[in-house]
Every structure is written in C-alpha cells, then in structure tokens.
A protein has these predicted regions:
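Nucleotide/phosphate-binding catalytic cleft detector across ATP-hydrolyzing
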Residues: 1-154, 162-251
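Acidic, divalent-metal-coordinating active-site segment for phosphoryl/phosphodiester hydrolysis
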Residues: 159
Length: 251
C-alpha cells in the first residue's frame, strides 16, 4: 500500500500514528531502550516500556521527550524512524509527508528540532501543528468560526488550555502537571499509606482503571500489587477511586 501522508501525535508518554482513511495504526509508549556499551537501540515502544526500571546497568530505557518537546535528539530520531518504518511496512519505498503535533508553547528552536528529527527519520516533508488545533479538529470543533472555543488537553507531560478562534490560538496556558505527575502522586500515596512500593506502570493502571479527580458516592475499586517495604515480599491491597482523588488532590 502506497502511503502518502501520516500524522504523528508525539506525546511525552505515548505516541500515536494516524493514516488518513484508516485511523490510528500505532499507539505505543514514547520510550527507547539503549545498549549503553555500543549505543545501539534495543527496543522502542511497548517492548522498551517492559524494560523500564528492570534493565541491567548496561541497558538504559529513556523517555526522549520532556514536557512535550525533544529532550534527547538522537533518541527521538531513532524512535521516529521506528514508528515511521512500522507504519509504512517493508514494501513501501516512498517517503511520506509527516505532520507532527507539538505543544502550544513550542519555541521556534524546539519546532525546528522536531522537524529536522522527522526528516532525518525518513519523512519527505515534515510539518508541525500545535496540539490544541489538532485536538479541536479531532473533536469536530469548527476552528475557523469567529466564536471562541476552549480546549483542555491533558497529556503525559503537560496539560494545556487554549482558546481557539478564526483558525488560530488566541490565548493559551501550559502546566507541567499532567498524567505522569498523577502516576507519581499515586505511587507516593500508596507508599505512605500502605508501606507498599509500586512501579509507574502499576500506578498508571490504577489511574486508568479507577482514576477520579473528585470523591464519588459509588466508589470504584481495584487490586494493587507491589513490594512490602518492610519485608521485601510481594503484597496486594485494594484501593478505591476516592483514594486516587485524595492522592492527586495536590495537583
């Protein structure tokens, strides 16, 4: 299949690849695993996430983006190369036009870094569109109308609020408090209250399954398994949605 254009939602936590007419074809964690001895990429996405926090000293698993922008250029380029190659398949010899998302407050230098990394990763042409615009289009909002529309986009590294009118962003604000901070808050809450250590994947699972910003009358529950900090042995607890609300209340 000849793919002319692809869209990449390049997030701090997860990356999504979109093909017109087919929708989302790739949804994987924004993580790259490296062999530190020879600087070789070992895994990207789901496979690399499995290595996070479990790798030996000679293997490093990194998130190459921070707060929605490139923190490690070389690693980001390798990751983009993987996602583009996976999307196109081995039989597609043509370079696609790639549209990449970026934060509302991205600087010209940060924009250029994303475009250059995308071109070096295998794109024929690369363009960056700010995330609030893409979120509005995805939600079916008429961005070219004269009336204002407020978009709240909560990602892994940043949460952005933007007002859109006449096809552009009139005003915006960005907070470096988003999904990853919620995961950290949940893990810290479990550690303090239950003396139980849990990893970021477990904390994320709790957030997704029973996450709530406010107390609920009908509480949701889930089992949380971790390591007892006194004995070092595995132990399970039952956590509810109101506890999650309490854990993230400071954010």
């Amino acid at each position: 299949m000849f793919i002319k254009r692809i869209g990449i939602d390049l997030g701090t936590t997860n990356t999504l690849v979109f093909i017109p007419g087919k929708g989302a074809v790739v949804f994987e964690p924004t993580i790259v695993a490296y062999d530190l001895n020879d600087n070789k990429v070992l895994a990207v996405g789901h496979e690399a996430k499995e290595m996070l926090g479990r790798t030996p000293n000679d293997i490093g698993a990194y998130r190459p983006l921070k707060d929605g922008v490139i923190a490690d250029y070389k690693t980001t380029k390798a990751m983009l190369q993987y996602f583009i190659s996976k999307t196109l398949g081995s039989f597609n010899i043509f370079k696609p036009i790639v549209i990449v998302s970026g934060p509302a407050g991205i600087t010209s230098t940060e924009r250029r870094a994303v475009i250059n990394a995308t071109l070096e990763a295998g794109a024929r042409e690369a363009y960056l569109v700010r995330e609030p615009i893409l979120a509005a289009l995805g939600a079916g909002i008429p961005i070219n109308s004269a009336s204002g529309h407020m978009i709240v986009n909560i990602g892994g590294g940043t949460a952005e609020v933007a007002v859109i009118s006449l096809g552009g962003i009139v005003s915006w604000a960005s907070l470096r408090i988003a999904g990853n901070k919620f995961d950290e808050a949940i893990a810290e809450y479990v550690k303090k209250k239950y003396n139980l250590a849990i990893g970021e994947q477990t904390a994320e699972k709790v957030k997704i399954e029973i996450g709530s910003a406010v107390n609920q009358k009908n509480k949701l529950e889930c089992e949380v398994r971790g390591r007892d900090l006194d004995t070092g042995l595995p132990r399970s607890i039952t956590m509810n949605s109101n506890e999650v609300a309490e854990a993230i209340s400071g954010h």
